Amino acid sequence: MATGTEPHLNSGGVRTGTRAAITAPHLRTDRWWLAPAVTAAGLLAFIVYSTWRAFANADYYAAPYVSPFYSPCLAENCETMRAGPNWDLFGSWWGISPAIIILIFPLGFRLTCYYYRKAYYRGFWMSPPACAVAEPHKKYSGETRFPLILQNIHRYFFYAALLVAGILTYDTVLAFRDENYEWGHMGLGTLVFLANIALIWAYTLSCHSCRHIVGGKLKHFSKHPVRYRMWQWIGKLNARHMQLAWASLVSVALADFYVYLVASGVFDDPRFF
């Protein structure tokens, strides 16, 4: 170091010879802890809610709406959904909630997402808790060891997320029916589903892996004008990846909650026509 001194080692933070020789864990005077605390609270709230709904195995279908947590329904014990996404692929041996089957894929996509990794690394593991704030861990291995090395399968979860988004789009189209499965109708739930699927697609396509797949390997953009234009569009979405991550997380929970309220008889779906 320029001062010829070594940093003072203590029990907090990863300390190496490249760090400033200060004894304080950080010099920030703002409320740096607020962002990771709010992030942790928001993620924890969603985890609690989604766990309850996934294992409830009830009140997830109110014609013509099916909860995004249960779509597609791949077990024999699914509620009958006329022309809906109830495809009996797992048979009768699957005895618990069918939501557990499908939620693996959207949750896997979000858990390995670059933004969510930053969010829960900071919010739950404090690794690091904030910029210019030393983390409390003595060692750092990054994502080179199990289980964090599994984060590298994010690109494959992206393809699964595309399939799930396609199925949810199908569910949204079915939402233009009434409770008697007649087409040409629209209710408040239809608007809820439209908002949700728009945010789901925006979040999915704003993914860093999507941006790389579209234009990351191109050496000459001039030779691929269509992919270059798509790469630019996705880049604009990518700049809002954090906002879209939270907005879509809230929207999918609200869509499920709306179906729950209608299916459990709290109120009837208001119909516009």
Tell where the protein language model's regions lie, with residue ranges.
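Membrane-embedded alpha-helical bundles that constitute the cytochrome b-like, heme-associated redox core
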Residues: 2-273
